[in-house]
């Protein structure tokens, strides 16, 4: 659980909702759906359930049905695998009355995502929400982060072209070397001046250094630069994002709409982190 990452990011209200239905005393079975469609993959969600099965005898001999409603594009740098794992862990704990604390359930989600190679710092970020700086790696309760205040008038504007493989890039020695070489310096500069403007500036500098900017992202970044709007690229997604005053949203929409490919997403910032819904 001490494996993780340092870094920074922002959580969106355009999130993931997970519904869990449990039938006790049945033949052990797990069914997972995404958007009302049954899926055979969902490796991170299956790993979460596997960990629960290993730790709690009461989870065995249960028919578990999981339904993920994912609001953000999958695989495009929005942390959807971490969100699915986290929401599932919280929901399973509640549905089966397992008695874990919120942090303990979140730790299960973190371990599952690390094992599956789909993320290192996503779960802790989504546990607390907001704009966070992860200053010590690890699962929730072990890793440490600093929260940067985000005014309510700010929204996150994104233009999404498609997915990039987190697992592929986290296992690539060259990409990891580039991340590690500059990541610590960028984090130190952000901690020294923990502002939204500095976050966006350093995020862009980091994206340029890592070297994963696609042709579509480059074209849109250039247009945003000409319009004096600071944009960056999330790790890891074929996407462009900016944090902007919602009263000025038309300006960035004009820039995004010049790009024929992709789609635009606007979301407010989630300040509370993952929560159980009534």
Residue ranges and their predicted role:
Residues 1, 9-12, 58-59, 116-118, ...:
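Solvent-exposed alpha-helices and their adjacent loops that cap or buttress functional pockets
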Residues 16-20, 122-126, 131-133, 240-242, ...:
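Short beta-strand scaffold segments in enzyme catalytic cores
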Residues 1-74, 255, 268-273, 278:
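ATP-binding N-lobe of GHMP and related small-molecule kinases
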Residues 63-67, 101-111, 201:
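Beta-strand segments within the central parallel beta-sheet cores of soluble alpha/beta enzyme folds
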Residues 102-147:
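Alpha/beta catalytic cores of group-transfer enzymes, especially the acyltransferase/condensing modules
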């Amino acid at each position: 659980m001490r494996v993780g990452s340092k870094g920074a990011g922002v959580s969106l209200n355009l999130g993931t909702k997970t519904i869990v239905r449990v039938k006790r005393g049945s033949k052990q079975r797990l069914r997972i759906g995404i958007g009302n469609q049954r899926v055979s993959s969902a490796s991170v969600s299956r790993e979460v359930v596997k960990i629960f099965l290993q730790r709690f005898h009461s989870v065995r001999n249960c028919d578990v049905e999981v339904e993920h409603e994912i609001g953000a594009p999958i695989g495009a740098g929005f942390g959807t695998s971490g969100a699915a794992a986290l929401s599932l862990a919280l929901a399973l704990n509640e549905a089966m009355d397992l008695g874990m604390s919120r942090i303990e359930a979140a730790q299960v989600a973190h371990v599952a995502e690390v094992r599956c190679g789909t993320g290192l710092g996503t779960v802790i970020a989504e546990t607390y929400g907001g704009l966070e700086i992860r200053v010590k790696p690890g699962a929730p309760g072990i890793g440490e982060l600093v929260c940067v205040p985000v005014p309510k008038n700010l929204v996150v504007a994104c233009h999404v072209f498609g997915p990039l493989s987190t697992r592929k890039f986290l296992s690539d020695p060259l990409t990891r070397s580039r991340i590690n070489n500059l990541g610590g310096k960028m984090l130190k500069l952000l901690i020294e001046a923990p502002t939204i403007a500095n976050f966006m500036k350093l995020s862009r500098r980091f994206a340029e250094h890592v070297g994963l900017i696609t042709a579509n992202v480059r074209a849109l970044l250039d247009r945003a630069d000409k319009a004096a709007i600071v944009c960056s690229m999330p790790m890891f997604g074929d996407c462009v994002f900016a944090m902007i005053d919602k009263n000025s949203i038309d300006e960035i929409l004009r820039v995004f709409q010049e790009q024929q490919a992709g789609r635009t997403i606007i979301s407010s910032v989630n300040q509370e982190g993952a929560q159980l819904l009534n």
